[in-house]
């Protein structure tokens, strides 16, 4: 139990950028994607009962970068501004499209992020 408490303490002290990097490393190590369970949960919930998941979908949206387009540098800059990621992390996200840029945001914020990405030359979807 002492080891688990130490792990919890260490994880609690991580910065947002360090947590994002840890997430990425764990995804690579375990061969999973953090974005996939969110989509699966939404689809699974919709099959269970249409009324409750429909309300949840209306309040939280994910902005997905589907294509970086020809002007990757501007898109990387915009992704950095939106997410607060470092240069390498933003570049990896853009080059790994389709990927979620921002998850669980309001409809207005999702539309704003999508517009910023499209203005930078990328293609994005709000889901």
Swiss-Prot record:
Signal peptide: none annotated. CDD domains: Ribosomal_L7_L12. InterPro entries: Ribosomal_bL12, Ribosomal_bL12_C, Ribosomal_bL12_C/ClpS-like, Ribosomal_bL12_oligo, Ribosomal_bL12_oligo_N_sf. Transmembrane segments: none annotated. One of its GO terms (cellular component) is cytosolic large ribosomal subunit. GO terms for molecular function: mRNA binding; structural constituent of ribosome. The keyword Ribosomal protein applies. Pfam families: Ribosomal_L12, Ribosomal_L12_N. The keyword Ribosomal protein applies. Keywords: Ribonucleoprotein, Ribosomal protein. GO terms for biological process: translation. It comes from the Bacteria. Coiled coil: none annotated. Forms part of the ribosomal stalk which helps the ribosome interact with GTP-bound translation factors. Is thus essential for accurate translation. Belongs to the bacterial ribosomal protein bL12 family. NCBIfam families: L12. Homodimer. Part of the ribosomal stalk of the 50S ribosomal subunit. Forms a multimeric L10(L12)X complex, where L10 forms an elongated spine to which 2 to 4 L12 dimers bind in a sequential fashion. Binds GTP-bound translation factors. This is Large ribosomal subunit protein bL12. The lineage of its organism: Bacteria, Pseudomonadati, Pseudomonadota, Alphaproteobacteria, Hyphomicrobiales.
